[in-house]
């Protein structure tokens, strides 16, 4: 996910996307705790996606 993809979205789309990513992060953390997660780099990528979405949300709210 690139920031350039996110800056074209409106506020509602970004909020929905943020909620989906947070749910995914929760599921990944649960899988990690139960030793079901084999690719731990997914956690890092999901956290970075959440940060990008939050940055885009801040930019949209500022305008």
From Swiss-Prot:
UniProt record similarity statement: Belongs to the universal ribosomal protein uL29 family.
Name of the protein: Large ribosomal subunit protein uL29
One of the protein's GO biological processes: translation
Cellular component terms (Gene Ontology): ribonucleoprotein complex; ribosome
GO molecular function, one term: structural constituent of ribosome
UniProt KW keywords: Ribonucleoprotein, Ribosomal protein
Species in which this protein is naturally found: Aliarcobacter butzleri (strain RM4018)
Coiled-coil ranges per UniProt: none
